[in-house]
Amino acid sequence: MEINNVISKTQLTINSNKDSLNDIYFKKFSIIIPAYNEEKRIVATLSQICHFISETKFPWEIIISVDGNDGTEEIVKEMMKQFPFLRFIKGNGRNGKGNAIKRAVDIANGSYFIFMDADNSIAFREVLNAVPEIMNNDVVILERYSIAKNQIPFQRELVSRGFNLLVRSTLGIKVRDTQSGYKILKEEYARRAFNSITVTNTFYDVALLYKIRKLGGKIIEKPVIYRHDLESKFNIISEILGQGLSLLAFRMRHSPFYKYIPRKLRDLYYRKFRWI
C-alpha cells in the first residue's frame, strides 16, 4: 500500500521518514471517543475516521463510550453494521468523562490509544500528523493554546490558564494544556495509570498525566489548529467548582497529611463531587 495515497486522501502533511511512518501507522491503535448526548455531532466525526480506516486497512479500532439517553447509541449501532472495527460500550446514566474513557480502555485491544472528543474541534488530520510523535514518547497532547489564530472563548481560556497555574504549582505538571481531549498514549502507561484513578469528572486528565509522570512516562505537547464548537458544553461555575475541589482533594490524597483527614470528609467528596 502506498502511504502517500492514503495521506493525500486525508490531507495529511508528512514531515518525517516514510518508512518510520509506515511502521507506526500499521501498529494497533484504539481510538476512544466519549459521547454524552452527541447525536447531532457524532456522525460527522465518525464518518471521516471510519472511512479512513476502511480505505487504509490499518489495524485500528474505534470505541464509542456512551453516556446519556439521546439517539447516539442507535446512530453508532447502525454505523457498526458497515464498519466492523467500530465498537460500542455504554454506562448507566452519566458517570463522568473520565469514567467513560476508563470503560473503553478496559475493553480496548490497541497497543496505542488515541483519545478524541466527539465535537471534532481538532481535525482528524491533525491527530494523524501527531501519531509519529508517540514513537519516542509515552503521551502526546494535542495542545490548543500556542497557535495564535485558535479562537478560544475568553471565559474558557481564562479558567484553563488559571487552573493550569494551580496544577503546575501544586502538582508540578509542566504541561500547558492538561485539559485537551485529544491525546495519544502508549497502552502500558495508560492502563497502569487508569488502574489507580478514582476521579471521574474532567479532572481525570490531570490525574492521568500525574500518574503517568510518576511511572516515568515522557509527556510532550504538539500545538495544533483548534476550531471552537459553539455548541460545546461549558458551565464556568460548575467547571471552577468541580476542578477546584478535585485539585484540592487530589493534592491532599497524595500528601503526607492524607491519613489525618476525617473519613467522613473523604467519603463526602467521592459521593458528591467527583462526578461534577
Feature locations, PLM:
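A conserved acidic beta->alpha catalytic loop
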Residues: V66-E74, N120
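Acceptor/aglycone-binding surface of glycosyltransferases and processive sugar-polymer synthases
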Residues: G91-I107, Y112, F124-T202, D229-L245
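Conserved donor nucleotide-binding strand/loop of the catalytic core
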Residues: W60, E73-I107
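Short, well-formed alpha-helical segments that are part of the catalytic scaffolds
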Residues: I14-K18, E38-I53
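Hydrophobic helical membrane-anchoring modules
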Residues: M1-F29, S196-I276
